[in-house]
Amino acid sequence: MEDLTEKQSLVFEFIMEYTADHGYPPTVRELCDELGFKSPNTAHFHLKGLKDKGYIQSAKGKNRGITVLKTPPGAGGKIPLVGRIAAGAPILAVENVMDTLDVDRAFFGSSDAFSVRVEGDSMIEAHIEDGDYVVIKPTATPRNGDIVAALVNDEVTLKYFHRDGSRIELRPANVRYKPFCYTEEDFIDVRVLGVMAGLIRKV
């Protein structure tokens, strides 16, 4: 990251690591706590530097409004875009790679990470918007509360995962939508493809 100052590099690396671990970006307060900034103004100063250099976008009025726009020069690897996820009413899954995103998969903690494009607003309360690209880390064993990409009857959807004994719920993050509920008999038609590892928003 030759074009970034030392502090900007530290801020950017923390944003990437935090997003990879949690599936959403850190708040300014979390940046301050992690990097020892005494004032939010210091964090905002370095975030503005990253924004001016095209690394991030910061949405006003949002607690977690940081969006990564690019990775450092020289970062290797690209994330395959394998189709679209329906956030709301699922659409037919596209199995072949449609495109790639110029983002290093290593930032998301998985060499097998792939991306999908969101359609709809059923995850809007999780700050996932129509047109966003969600990075998925493959796993078949999600934890309750994880946001997962699930294949249901050959269609892909993005939802919160919750399992209670022999019952699985795929829950939206929008009060206008109802959860999908499945019993053990339905499991043959429900397959978790992976958990959300990050989000990319193009502007």
Curated annotation (Swiss-Prot):
What interactions and quaternary structure are annotated? Homodimer.
NCBIfam families tied to this protein: lexA
Main function? Represses a number of genes involved in the response to DNA damage (SOS response), including recA and lexA. In the presence of single-stranded DNA, RecA interacts with LexA causing an autocatalytic cleavage which disrupts the DNA-binding part of LexA, leading to derepression of the SOS regulon and eventually DNA repair.
Organism, by scientific name, is Desulfatibacillum aliphaticivorans
Q: Which domain of life is it from?
A: Bacteria
Annotated catalytic residues: 122 (for autocatalytic cleavage activity), 159 (for autocatalytic cleavage activity)
Enzyme class of the recorded protein, top EC level: hydrolase
Give start and end residues of each DNA-binding region: 28-48
The Gene Ontology biological process terms listed for this entry are: DNA repair; DNA replication; negative regulation of DNA-templated transcription; proteolysis; SOS response
Q: Name one GO molecular function term.
A: DNA binding
Is Coiled coil included in the keywords of this UniProt record?
Answer: no
Q: Name the residues annotated as site: Cleavage.
A: 87-88
Reaction(s) this enzyme catalyzes, per UniProt: Hydrolysis of Ala-|-Gly bond in repressor LexA
Alphabetically ordered keywords of this record: Autocatalytic cleavage, DNA damage, DNA repair, DNA replication, DNA-binding, Hydrolase, Repressor, SOS response, Transcription, Transcription regulation
Which family does the entry's similarity section mention?
Belongs to the peptidase S24 family.
What protein name does the entry list?
LexA repressor
Give one Pfam family: LexA_DNA_bind
- Keyword Repressor in record: yes
Q: What is its EC number?
A: 3.4.21.88
